């Protein structure tokens, strides 16, 4: 399946289609969208965002605990969309504050 991903970035909103087996960060790069990242393995907070709407599967990640994920935190480098989704990006400072 393919889902609509809307990213709310400091530079404005970006929308694209993302297959359910492609990480959101990878697909964003394919679309020419510049997002922050570091490890690309779900073990740091550089790419952190907040899911505002919809669902993701980020079971490949290890940095976030269950409580953070329940609050909507997402690591875009290990997140697959499982529905149409809206994500606020560039949230590392807020997450680690």
Curated annotation (Swiss-Prot):
Residues 3-93 form the 2Fe-2S ferredoxin-type domain. Its cofactor is [2Fe-2S] cluster. Gene3D superfamilies: 3.10.20.30. Keywords: 2Fe-2S, Chloroplast, Electron transport, Iron, Iron-sulfur, Metal-binding, Plastid, Transport. One of its GO terms (cellular component) is chloroplast stroma. One of its GO terms (biological process) is electron transport chain. It comes from the Eukaryota. [2Fe-2S] cluster binds at residues 39, 44, 47, 77. SUPFAM superfamilies: 2Fe-2S ferredoxin-like. GO terms for molecular function: 2 iron, 2 sulfur cluster binding; electron transfer activity; metal ion binding. It is found in: Plastid, Chloroplast. Binds 1 [2Fe-2S] cluster. Its main location: plastid. PANTHER family: FERREDOXIN, FERREDOXIN-2, CHLOROPLASTIC. Belongs to the 2Fe2S plant-type ferredoxin family. Ferredoxins are iron-sulfur proteins that transfer electrons in a wide variety of metabolic reactions. NCBIfam families: fdx_plant. This is Ferredoxin-A. It comes from Alocasia macrorrhizos.
